[in-house]
């Protein structure tokens, strides 16, 4: 089952992406480097729950 998640910037800007992931294939927390336009750099984004 695919669940919706939020990827929050580790730069502390409050910027986030929303995506989904398959919990059966990726049981752990997702971490991925993406572009944060507020700091204009690629930073690490960590998974958080959508409230």
Swiss-Prot record:
The keyword Ribosomal protein applies. Signal peptide: none annotated. It comes from Pseudoalteromonas atlantica (strain T6c / ATCC BAA-1087). GO terms for biological process: translation. One of its GO terms (cellular component) is cytosolic large ribosomal subunit. This is Large ribosomal subunit protein bL33. It holds the Pfam family Ribosomal_L33. Keywords: Ribonucleoprotein, Ribosomal protein. NCBIfam families: PRK00595.1, rpmG_bact. Belongs to the bacterial ribosomal protein bL33 family. InterPro entries: Ribosomal_bL33, Ribosomal_bL33_CS, Ribosomal_bL33_sf, Ribosomal_zn-bd. SUPFAM superfamilies: Zn-binding ribosomal proteins. One of its GO terms (molecular function) is structural constituent of ribosome.
